């Protein structure tokens, strides 16, 4: 510190203290008696202010208050007070000085200042004792009277300044940290790349390089590394004389220069202190000795051989095999690669069959009539109601114009193929139907009924289609019949098949005209033969009807052409007379039954031999019981069914049957009987057409007849 600053600090600190009244007195005395000292202390104060600007502003509040007071007074004493106040919290050593000065400042003059400066360093170590002694000394001081020359404004300002008190001292926090130890575990490590230096090359790769290029590897590391002291002792043992060492140094330097300064051994720089202690002198000497040994060692090594250049021509590029892209199936990409445990199992029903997905319901397609109804429902209905009665009359007239069909009942056998279609009236064919009639007719028609098959889902149609597929049944062809169940042909003794005894003569195919001529030539008898008179056209029509009812498809005759056809009235009369002569047809009970009932009845009519139904099937143990029971019972008369059932006549061609009766011309009574016989024959032919399974029914009837006959014989025998 400057001596001026050292003098200025105690003067300014003298005025500060715990008792403001004592400060006032000393300030006033100093201001009056020593104005020169206050002027001399101003430059150091300004210097200290500049020094404090760089420091942190800890006490801003006291500065502002003291500046305000100094502006009001405008005196040198006040300026000194503000300078001393602002300079207070600089160092803890300075804070202790003003506490000790009030006791030493009793004598006035520069001696008190010098005593304060000398006493400060000695008492700096006991700040607590000084604080305790201050208040007692301050109370013991007598209060001198205030000067009469001071105004009341200054006294008021002094009192106001005294009420502010001293700025609080900032004590530095000197408490030691007792928390956990903070450590930074992160550390940077340098990892050298493989092969960057020769040391980092792996041994196996080094062998390959030595074989190809002949480069020798680095020398192997020593097993036990020597310390610095051991190396110095080993090297310095040979250097007992100083002269060879010097010569060795010179030789080493010359060799290093001649080799182009390939290898240079630098001595380690030693940082020497100004006055090293006695303990470190020995270590410095050892370092100097080690430098000399290293230089001698480097001189003895000689020059380093230059590395040979690599011959790049001998290096061959390694040709790697070209890689091909192969598609590898991933697990789960296909169904086959999915493990069995993870496969999705389809939903099955009770029988284990997979459930078909329910088809989505498709909207039903609307018909034209429905679309027309929807489009026309918004129109007014008054016009349609008015127009409806008009076409009804027209339709009734048109219906009346159509000729009514024949009212008389004609048997089906005679009216099957020759009934003429009523011709359409010319008025309906030529005249166009008016629009009003069409609208009325469309309004009277009901809505189209939905087709039940139309709304069925696709799955049902597929099922129905599969049901309609035809398949060859077992036994339908001879190839499908097992060999054990095939019919064996009749063979002679030599094993040759027997030929039919009388080969059937094939009749030539006759045309319709020849058949009609053959049938009509026998009707040339006398008029007394029959009471009916027919024209040739009527007769041909009647004969064609009979021929059309025959089972032979070739002999069916169609109606005559329209040019030769007679009038409808005459034909109807002829047919009526012919139908009257035939008599009424007996209805066939099996004709109107559905196909399912026939199949069921046929299944019921099939006969199977039951146990005990015949004598052959009765066990011998139970035969005597039946014999005893039959002796007690009276004999039953033969049933009516057995009498009525007769063997049906053999099938005969209806044409032959008809033509056989027409060879002779019997009387009228005989002709009527013949017509009745013809009627019965034609009915049998028609019934054979209606019932396809008639042969099986006959077989069942024969079996029942045969079974009834032995039973009746047994009863008669018993």
UniProtKB/Swiss-Prot annotation:
Additional facts recorded: In erythrocytes the protein lacks the N-terminal region of the liver inhibitor but retains three inhibitory units.
Basic residues composition-biased segments: 20-29
One GO cellular component, as annotated: cytoplasm
Post-translational modification Blocked amino end (Ser), affected residues: 290
UniProt source species: Oryctolagus cuniculus (Rabbit)
Function recorded in the entry: Specific inhibition of calpain (calcium-dependent cysteine protease). Plays a key role in postmortem tenderization of meat and have been proposed to be involved in muscle protein degradation in living tissue.
Basic and acidic residues: bias regions: 30-61, 68-104, 320-331, 342-377, 384-399, 446-496, 566-579, 587-650, 706-718
Taxonomy, superkingdom: Eukaryota
Entry-annotated residues carrying N6-acetyllysine: 49
Name of the protein described by the UniProt record: Calpastatin
Assigned keywords, A-Z: Acetylation, Isopeptide bond, Phosphoprotein, Protease inhibitor, Repeat, Thiol protease inhibitor, Ubl conjugation
Inhibitory domain repeat coordinates: 170-222, 307-359, 450-503, 587-640
PTM-bearing positions, type Phosphoserine: 86, 133, 222, 243, 367, 369, 376, 444, 520, 531, 579, 581
């Amino acid at each position: 510190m400057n001596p001026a600053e050292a003098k200025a600090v105690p003067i300014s600190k003298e005025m500060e203290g715990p008792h403001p009244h004592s400060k006032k007195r000393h300030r006033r005395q100093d201001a009056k008696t020593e104005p020169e000292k206050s002027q001399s202390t101003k430059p150091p104060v300004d210097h200290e202010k500049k020094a404090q600007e760089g420091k942190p502003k800890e006490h801003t509040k006291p500065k502002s208050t003291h500046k305000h007071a100094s502006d009001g007074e405008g005196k040198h004493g006040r300026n000194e007070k503000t300078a001393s106040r602002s300079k207070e919290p600089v160092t803890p050593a300075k804070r202790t000085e003003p506490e000790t000065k009030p006791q030493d400042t009793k004598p006035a003059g520069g001696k008190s200042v010098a005593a304060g400066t000398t006493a400060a360093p000695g008492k700096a170590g006991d700040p607590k004792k000084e604080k305790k002694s201050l208040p007692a000394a301050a109370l013991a001081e007598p209060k001198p009277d205030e000067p009469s020359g001071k105004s009341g404004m200054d006294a008021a300002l002094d009192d106001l300044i005294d009420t502010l008190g001293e700025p609080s001292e900032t004590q530095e926090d000197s408490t030691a940290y007792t928390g956990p130890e903070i450590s930074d575990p992160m550390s940077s490590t340098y990892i050298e790349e493989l092969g960057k230096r020769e040391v980092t090359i792996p041994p196996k790769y080094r062998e390959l390089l030595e074989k190809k290029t002949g480069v020798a590897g680095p020398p192997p590391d020593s097993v036990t590394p020597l310390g610095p002291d051991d190396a110095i002792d080993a090297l310095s043992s040979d250097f007992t004389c100083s002269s060879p060492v010097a010569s060795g140094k010179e030789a080493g330097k010359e060799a290093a220069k001649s080799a182009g300064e390939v290898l240079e051994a630098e001595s380690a720089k030693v940082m020497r202190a100004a006055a090293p202690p006695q303990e470190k002198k020995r270590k410095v000497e050892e370092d100097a000795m080690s430098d000399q040994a290293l230089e001698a060692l480097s001189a003895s090594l000689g020059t380093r051989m230059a590395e040979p250049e690599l011959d790049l021509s001998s290096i061959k590029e390694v040709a790697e095999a070209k890689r091909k892209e192969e598609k590898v199936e991933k697990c789960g990409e296909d169904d086959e690669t999915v493990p069995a445990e993870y496969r999705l199992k389809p939903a099955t029903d009770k029988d284990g069959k997979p459930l078909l997905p329910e088809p989505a319901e498709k909207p039903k397609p609307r018909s034209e009539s429905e679309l027309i109804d929807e489009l026309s429902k918004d129109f007014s209905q008054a016009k349609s109601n008015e127009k409806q009665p008009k076409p009804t009359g027209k339709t009734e007239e048109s219906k009346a114009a159509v000729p009514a069909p024949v009212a008389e009942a004609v048997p089906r056998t005679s009216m099957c193929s020759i009934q003429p279609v009523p011709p359409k009236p010319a008025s309906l064919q030529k005249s166009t139907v008016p629009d009003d009639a069409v609208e009325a007719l469309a309004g009277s028609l009901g809505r189209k009924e939905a087709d039940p098959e139309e709304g069925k889902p696709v799955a049902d149609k597929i099922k129905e289609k599969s049901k309609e597929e035809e398949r060859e049944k077992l036994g339908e062809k001879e190839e499908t019949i097992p060999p054990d169940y095939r019919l064996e042909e009749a063979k002679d003794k030599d094993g040759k098949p027997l030929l039919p005894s009388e080969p059937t003569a094939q009749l030539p195919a006759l045309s319709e005209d020849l058949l009609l001529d053959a049938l009509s030539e026998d009707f040339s008898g006398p008029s007394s033969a029959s009471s009916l008179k027919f024209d040739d056209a009527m007769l041909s029509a009647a004969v064609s009807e009979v021929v059309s009812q025959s089972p032979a498809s070739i002999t069916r005759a169609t109606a005559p052409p329209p040019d030769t056809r007679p009038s409808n009235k005459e034909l109807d009369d002829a047919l009526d007379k012919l139908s009257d002569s035939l008599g009424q047809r007996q209805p066939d009970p099996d004709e109107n039954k559905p196909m399912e009932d026939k199949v069921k009845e046929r299944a019921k009519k099939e006969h199977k031999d039951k146990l005990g139904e015949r004598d052959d099937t009765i066990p011998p143990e139970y035969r005597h019981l039946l014999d005893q029971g039959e002796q007690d019972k009276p004999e039953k008369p033969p049933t009516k069914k057995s009498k009525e059932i007769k063997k049906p006549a053999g099938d005969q061609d209806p044409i032959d049957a008809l033509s056989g009766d027409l060879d002779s011309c019997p009387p009228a009574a005989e002709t009527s009987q013949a017509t009745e016989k013809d009627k019965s024959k034609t009915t049998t032919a028609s019934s054979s057409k209606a019932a396809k399974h008639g042969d099986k029914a006959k077989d069942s009837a024969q079996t029942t007849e045969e079974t009834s006959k032995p039973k009746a014989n047994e009863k008669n025998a018993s």
